[in-house]
């Protein structure tokens, strides 16, 4: 995998390509940038997986998370809005990931709004309304659970599916996990996240 990066207004400094290996964030490549030189980072990759682009290894909040895959990937951003306004091209899995993230963000924003409302109601002791808000939160959680489950089962050829399964269903019962596994293609099951998911299932 080759990652070509353009960071507007970034004149000088290090830029790092990172990933998670054995639960630890590691640097897989880095380059010292000066005088508007091309930024090219590389990594060996067997199947699509999450990578991170970072300007400061001590600050995990200001990094770009993306799905890497074989081939050439281009990332365009700026120093001022490094991880909040960027464009990624060349990774079909990342395009799918962006769409998924946008849906989950809507769930999270709705949940935060309801939690804030519940705090406000608690201050004025509106207990009946608090119960209604909690019911809405429970309903939202259920809808998100079902969305994730439906997504994974309906997109068995997507390399994103086993990652969602790992993050959202690791604690689920064997029936749910078997259903998820049976929906995945052999290619996906043999990917990095597919193998991790399969190990979770074997330990049930």
Can you say where each PLM-predicted feature lies in the sequence?
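Start-of-domain marker
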Residues: 1-81
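Generic alpha-helical secondary structure signal
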Residues: 14, 101-104, 197
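Preference for long, solvent-exposed alpha-helical segments and helix-linker "stalks"
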Residues: 44-50, 54-192
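TPR/TPR-like alpha-solenoid helical repeat scaffolds
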Residues: 170-171, 194-204
């Amino acid at each position: 995998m080759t990652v070509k990066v353009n960071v507007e207004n970034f004149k000088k400094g290090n830029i790092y390509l990172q990933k998670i290996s054995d639960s630890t964030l590691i640097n897989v490549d880095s380059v010292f940038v000066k005088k508007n030189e091309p930024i090219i980072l590389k990594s060996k990759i067997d199947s699509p997986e999450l990578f991170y682009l970072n300007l400061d290894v001590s600050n995990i909040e200001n990094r770009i998370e993306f799905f890497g895959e074989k081939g050439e990937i281009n990332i365009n951003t700026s120093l001022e809005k490094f991880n909040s306004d960027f464009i990624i091209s060349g990774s079909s899995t990342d395009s799918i990931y962006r769409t998924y993230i946008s849906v989950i963000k809507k769930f999270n924003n709705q949940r935060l709004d309801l939690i804030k409302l519940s705090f406000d109601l608690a201050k004025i002791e509106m207990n009946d309304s608090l119960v209604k808000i909690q019911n809405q939160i429970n309903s939202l959680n259920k809808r998100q659970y079902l969305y994730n489950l439906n997504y994974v089962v309906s997109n068995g050829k997507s390399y994103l599916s086993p990652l969602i399964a790992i993050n959202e269903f690791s604690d689920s019962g064997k029936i749910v996990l078997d259903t998820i596994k049976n929906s995945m293609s052999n290619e996906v099951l043999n990917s990095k996240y597919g193998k991790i998911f399969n190990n979770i299932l074997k330990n049930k």
